[in-house]
From Swiss-Prot:
Biased composition regions of type Polar residues, renumbered to the chain: 55-65
HAMAP family: SlyX
Protein family membership: Belongs to the SlyX family.
Underlying gene: slyX
Start and end residues of each stretch annotated as Disordered: 53-72
Domain of life from the UniProt record: Bacteria
Name recorded for this polypeptide: Protein SlyX
Pfam families linked: SlyX
Amino acid sequence: MQDITMEARLAELESRLAFQEITIEELNLTVTAHEMEMAKLRDHLRLLTEKLKASQPSNIASQAEETPPPHY
């Protein structure tokens, strides 16, 4: 009786281990895909930042360059 219980427990553990290995592999693939997507997004962000810095400055003067109002 005890041998059957031990065999059943062993079979259950082996089954759980197999499912866990499959889940870990699926999660690994998902993490890898997300890392690749994040790398692409970082590159796009870098390019957009460079374009923004290279664009012409605004025609609006900064507050330091503005003349104070007449009542000041």
